[in-house]
Amino acid sequence: MLVAPEALRIAYLQTVLTVDGRPASDVADEMGSFWVVTAHNPLSEQLAAAKNTELHQELCGRLDEMGYQSLPALGSSPDGTWVEESIAVFGAGKRPIRALGREFNQHGVFEVTKRTLRVHGCFSRWTVQR
């Protein structure tokens, strides 16, 4: 079983999420809870930009197949030195989103509600929140 190190889980909680250029919390206030997933940098291994773009396009295709409403999103470190193109997904449950995260070799996926940001492990059952 693959488990994200504690330091990585803490870093995930510091992630700044935007959806279509807006703070994720504003979008949750307007549209309700949603998930944020990425295909960039699988298992935190930094890849070339072209490979990350290819993976992102594959993720977009999978979400289209699954029939979920989605919007473009970004996840970044607080200082902006680490930015990953992501997708905000509406109307999905935890199980299919975690499975999608595993499919794209992601340690975790983000759940955004009006008051809380949670990060759920994809390969093991852990959750952290702020």
Where do the protein language model's features map onto the residues?
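N-terminal, charge-rich interaction modules
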Residues: 1-62
